[in-house]
């Protein structure tokens, strides 16, 4: 039935009444399972979310596991075929004051409404709810670990939308009802803070959010707000990557010391500076830190430019393609000014220039121009200069006339410090035993550490629970095996199958919403489960540039904290990939 013209509360009650009637006729549910719904009431509809009040955490657990799919299917039918997703709110215990206790008549009325709604008989169409769940994929062949992860993760079963919200002021001051591990508070978040997405309706007028207690009173509870990446349009520097945010240890102390000297301008003998090491160990961070320090601390302000080898290549090719079309300002002159009139040139992933003779020739002359002008040059690579493949000896010798430093995988103490800083940036308190657990299990690089912590934060955010060792164990139980080699083609093929697409759909130029989401998840998993650089991942995905990959990875990481279905997609695919490779 169409209830769009009703107020949010009436619309919710109408849809929920029809939903209960549909579930009542579901022959696959036992009387015991249906009994859990007797005390559930609808509070409001906001966009495509229906807020449901439940009496206790035990009921919530059943609704978000055993009854999750039947509820979503029935809600969609009751909403006229349009997706409607539940957000559950555990109601606080009744206060002892007589004036705040619901009357027996009110309770009886709710129960009567629930019982009287069971009159229609419509079977839910469970296959129409998401692009992914097929009978084959949700049957007994599904890995038990994946099912357990999904069961433990769900708090709001919404495939592509936001966390749970409330449309009214709380009845009691938050300080009187502190947040607990079961989150016995209303789940609230203002709609104004959520970016609009397709299929998501506008917020309700007058929506307000209760004031949470100060963070000092929310020991271990999650506060949204992950620090983002901001790239300066002129320098291309990420303002978040500074020496202050670079955690040093035995594995990178020398590299940081030399990098700081170059940034200060005192390390003239360190020109050029070559930083090498494996993926995800902090090379790019040091490049940005050098640039940010120089810009912020030196007078006059130096001209700084950070680029990847891919960007350098693309700029040169574009300058050749358009050269001569602008007689007053030829394209090549623009290229020369951009790269040869800077005071500090920072170039990342230099190894990808190997074998590109024309590009290397241009870089050779750019290097000489800057070096002869006593300008600073810093390059980063995955190998030391003498191991660069398909580079001319004359260029390698110029790299080696400065200083070469390496960054190694961080030790345990450094990994713990990195995790603590990441937690602070996400405004979440993480107990030391959790930091130790993650640091002990993920030892290869910083990217692994960050990925593991993000999964834990996402779980805490979705369930509105504090971060504990138990939650961390449950969240990461399928990700502690890190010695499995995953190929990007395996990831793409698995993601394509998962979303009922083809390999070519994922790597091709198509941009339908379903394909774009699958492609972004595949990019995120490739970044998370391999040591490939952003540029190399972009090449695998149809020749896309590294900024596209970077955006996709950040987008999925952010949405995992907001949208239950995105979180489930990533978790299930990770489990399936490791399960497949271990078979």
Swiss-Prot record:
Compositionally biased tracts (Basic and acidic residues): 126-135, 147-174
Region described as Domain III, AAA+ region: spans on this chain: 236-460
Compartments reported by the entry: Cytoplasm
Gene3D superfamilies reported in the protein's UniProt record: 1.10.1750.10, 1.10.8.60, P-loop containing nucleotide triphosphate hydrolases
Residue sites binding ATP per the record: 280, 282-284
Annotated Pfam families: Bac_DnaA, Bac_DnaA_C
Positions of the UniProt region annotated as Domain I, interacts with DnaA modulators: 1-91
Region (Domain II): 91-235
Example GO molecular function: ATP hydrolysis activity
InterPro entries: AAA+_ATPase (IPR003593), Chromosome_initiator_DnaA (IPR001957), Chromosome_initiator_DnaA-like (IPR020591), Chromosome_initiator_DnaA_CS (IPR018312), DnaA_C (IPR013159), DnaA_dom (IPR013317), P-loop_NTPase (IPR027417), Trp_repressor/repl_initiator (IPR010921)
Domain notes: Domain I is involved in oligomerization and binding regulators, domain II is flexibile and of varying length in different bacteria, domain III forms the AAA+ region, while domain IV binds dsDNA.
Name used for this protein in its record: Chromosomal replication initiator protein DnaA
Source organism of this protein record: Bifidobacterium animalis subsp. lactis (strain AD011)
């Amino acid at each position: 039935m169409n209830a769009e013209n009703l107020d949010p509360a009436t619309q919710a009650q109408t849809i929920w009444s029809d939903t209960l009637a549909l579930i009542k006729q579901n022959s696959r549910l036992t009387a015991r399972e249906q009994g859990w719904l007797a005390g559930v009431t609808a509070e409001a509809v906001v966009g495509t979310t229906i807020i449901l009040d439940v009496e206790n955490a035990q009921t919530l657990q059943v609704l978000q596991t055993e009854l999750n799919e039947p509820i979503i299917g029935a809600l969609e039918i009751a909403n006229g075929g349009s997706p409607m997703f539940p957000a559950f709110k555990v109601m606080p215990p009744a206060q002892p004051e007589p004036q705040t206790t619901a009357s027996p008549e009110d309770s009886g009325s709710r129960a009567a409404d629930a019982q009287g709604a069971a009159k229609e008989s419509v079977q839910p169409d469970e296959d129409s709810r998401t692009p992914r769940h097929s009978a084959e994929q949700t049957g007994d062949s599904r890995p038990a670990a994946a099912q357990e992860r999904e069961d433990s993760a769900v708090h709001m079963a919404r495939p592509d939308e936001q966390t749970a919200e409330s449309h009214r002021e709380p009845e009691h001051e938050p300080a009187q009802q502190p947040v607990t591990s079961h989150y016995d508070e209303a789940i609230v978040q203002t709609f104004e803070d959520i970016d609009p997405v397709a299929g998501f309706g506008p917020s309700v007028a007058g929506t307000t959010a209760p004031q949470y207690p100060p963070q000092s009173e929310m020991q271990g509870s999650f506060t949204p707000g992950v620090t983002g990446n901001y790239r300066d349009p002129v320098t291309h520097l990420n303002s978040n990557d500074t020496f202050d945010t670079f955690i040093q240890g035995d594995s990178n102390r020398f590299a940081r010391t030399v990098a700081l000297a170059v940034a200060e301008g005192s390390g003239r003998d360190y020109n050029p500076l070559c930083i090498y090491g494996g993926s995800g160990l902090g090379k790019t961070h040091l490049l940005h830190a050098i640039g940010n320090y120089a810009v912020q601390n030196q007078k006059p302000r130096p001209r700084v430019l950070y680029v990847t080898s891919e960007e350098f290549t693309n700029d040169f090719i574009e300058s050749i393609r358009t050269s001569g079309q602008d007689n007053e300002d030829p394209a090549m002159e623009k290229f020369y000014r951009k790269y040869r009139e800077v005071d500090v040139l920072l170039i990342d992933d230099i190894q990808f220039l190997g074998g590109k003779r024309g590009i290397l020739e241009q870089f050779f002359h750019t290097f000489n121009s800057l070096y002869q002008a006593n300008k600073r040059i810093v390059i980063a690579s995955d190998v030391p200069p003498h191991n660069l493949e398909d580079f001319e000896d004359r260029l390698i010798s110029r790299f080696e006339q400065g200083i070469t430093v390496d960054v190694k995988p961080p030790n345990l103490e450094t990994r713990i410090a990195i995790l603590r800083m990441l937690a602070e940036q996400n405004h979440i308190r993480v107990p030391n035993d959790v930091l130790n657990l993650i640091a002990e299990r993920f030892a290869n690089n910083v990217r692994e550490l960050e990925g593991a912590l993000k999964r834990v934060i996402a779980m805490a955010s979705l369930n509105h629970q504090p971060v504990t060792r138990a939650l961390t164990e449950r969240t990461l139980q399928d990700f502690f095996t890190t010695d499995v080699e995953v190929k990007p083609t395996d990831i793409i093929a698995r993601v394509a199958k998962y979303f009922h697409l083809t390999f070519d759909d994922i790597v091709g130029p198509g941009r339908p919403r379903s394909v774009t989401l699958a492609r972004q998840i595949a990019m995120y998993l490739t970044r998370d489960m391999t040591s490939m650089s952003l540029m190399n991942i972009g090449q695998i995905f149809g020749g896309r540039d590294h900024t596209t990959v970077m955006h996709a990875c950040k987008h999925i990481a952010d949405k995992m904290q907001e949208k239950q279905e995105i979180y489930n997609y990533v978790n299930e695919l990770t489990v399936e990939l490791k399960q497949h490779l271990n078979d």
